[in-house]
Swiss-Prot record:
Subunit structure: Part of the 50S ribosomal subunit.
Protein name: Large ribosomal subunit protein uL1
GO biological process, one term: translation
Alphabetical UniProt keywords: Repressor, Ribonucleoprotein, Ribosomal protein, RNA-binding, rRNA-binding, Translation regulation, tRNA-binding
Organism: Mycobacterium ulcerans (strain Agy99)
Length: 235
């Protein structure tokens, strides 16, 4: 929805930007301000009090959302032999090695996550310039470089999300769909915030959660009170 459209302006008027909401209130308002016939994605944007240029202030992690994302992720796996068979059995959408690399080099990017066994990473490095900028490069810290590809596939299919602070100290992640009940959105939000807080760098000084906004892909940003770090489903 265009920010200049009548529907967007009407939705934005429902948001009191001077008064941050609780997570549950924000989830309810996000549902109300999503004016699209499609089931819009609900997203969270956080401004962190870190300097991502410094290695000791990088925030990167994963979390299993208790209610999933509302979308079944397409997963690509780099593996061979028994590991490849295990990935297929777990529901991976595409599995390969050199053949998959060639396909990606040719422009194939029809997947949302990439997993690799450790022995495949030297090969996967050949397409790092393709996967890296899209946030798809497998990494041990996010559990996507692992010998247990079956578990990794199951986790991602079940609603595991990855997040990483960008150069402007912002984090972005999905917490569900507008069709979710607000309680479920708030619980997903809480699970993600708990993990972000757990990963707070010791070198980060001052306020860590500086600004939080919840929105749908088609709706206005809704400010959330950063001080609410417990009891996420209370109004």
């Amino acid at each position: 929805m265009s920010k200049n459209s009548k529907a967007y302006r009407a939705a934005a008027e429902k948001v009191d930007r001077s008064n941050p909401y609780t997570p549950l209130q924000a989830a309810k308002l996000a549902k109300e301000t999503s004016s699209t016939k499609q089931d819009a994605t609900v997203e969270v944007a956080i401004r962190l009090g870190v300097d991502p240029r410094k290695a000791d202030q990088m925030v990167r992690g994963t979390v299993n959302l208790p209610h999933g994302t509302g979308k079944t992720a397409r997963v690509a796996v780099f593996a061979v032999g028994e590991k490849a068979d295990a990935a297929v059995a777990a529901g991976a959408d595409i599995v390969g090695s050199d053949d998959l690399i060639e396909k990606i080099q040719g422009g194939f990017l029809d997947f949302d996550a990439v997993i690799a066994t450790p022995d495949q990473m030297a090969k996967v490095g050949r397409i790092a310039r393709v996967l890296g900028p899209r946030g798809l490069m497998p990494n041990p810290k996010t559990g996507t470089v692992t010998p247990d590809v079956a578990k990794a596939v199951a986790d991602i299919k079940g609603g595991k999300i990855n997040f990483r602070v960008d150069k402007q100290a912002n984090l972005h992640f999905v917490i569900g769909k507008a069709s979710f009940e607000e309680n479920k959105l708030a619980e997903n939000y809480g699970a993600a915030i708990d993990e972000v807080l757990r990963l707070k760098p010791s070198a980060s000084k001052g306020r860590y959660l500086k600004k939080i906004t919840v929105s749908t892909t088609t709706g206005p940003g809704i400010p959330v009170d950063p001080s609410v770090t417990r009891n996420f489903t209370e109004a």
